[in-house]
Amino acid sequence: MEMGRRIHLELRNRTPSDVKELVLDNCRSIEGKIEGLTDEFEELEFLSTINVGLTSVANLPKLNKLKKLELSDNRISGGLEVLAEKCPNLTHLNLSGNKIKDLSTIEPLKKLENLKSLDLFNCEVTNLNDYRENVFKLLPQLTYLDGYDRDDKEAPDSDAEGYVEGLDDDEEDEDEEEYDEDAQVVEDEEDEEEEEEGEEEDVSGEEEEDEEGYNDGEVDDEEDEEDVGEEERGQKRKREPXDXGEDDD
């Protein structure tokens, strides 16, 4: 899927100014450039374009509020001065798996005064002698390089991804609200179904009672007939001796 198309889908009926987080991983860039992204995304704080075939960030729009930029697994080899111009408030930058070979390529990042974390995993520059020491000298504002500070202490997850988690929490709250609404609808439907079932049970119960009553009536009638028959037979037996006596006379 092309990047422009992917951005359109990610908007999901929102306006660009409503978007704080945009993930475009694994889509396809045209001619290795960013497309479809404009300065209308003025509230954007997190942008991820992992493995999209980028060779340049020249088309990156002005994103003053962008804090974290994921550019890993692309083919970027230079032109990073654009980042200082277009994303002046970057705090986290991931360039892992790109074609960065020497320190001069990352030197323009000195202008990113708020840059706190830089990742260059799987870039050729990491093979240079005294790589870490030289990068920290070149970019004194850095706290973490490839996930570790100057003393080789690992960056805590909360520091690296805290504000992104905050964005996720907001989205989860929205999802929970939607879920609650859906759940209420389902509950209402279930209540209606239960009421209908209850009414059906009442009707069937009445029918059963009527049938039982009808059957009981038949049994009572039969018993009454039997009683009448026995009485008649008794009367006959009583009359027979009397009749015999009259004959004797």
UniProtKB/Swiss-Prot annotation:
Protein name, as recorded: Acidic leucine-rich nuclear phosphoprotein 32 family member A
One cellular component (GO) term of this entry: cytoplasm
Family: Belongs to the ANP32 family.
Organism annotation: Canis lupus familiaris (Dog)
Modified residues (Phosphothreonine): T15
Cellular localisation: Nucleus; Cytoplasm; Endoplasmic reticulum
Posttranslational mods: Phosphorylated on serine residues, at least in part by casein kinase 2/CK2.
Any one GO MF annotation of this record: histone binding
Main location: nucleus
UniProt repeat feature LRR, residue ranges: 18-41, 43-64, 65-87, 89-110
Positions of the LRRCT domain: 123-161
Tagged with keyword Lyase: no
Region annotated Necessary for tumor-suppressive function, chain positions: 150-174
Region (Interaction with E4F1) residue spans: 165-249
PROSITE patterns: LRR (PS51450)
UniProt biased composition (Basic and acidic residues): 147-156
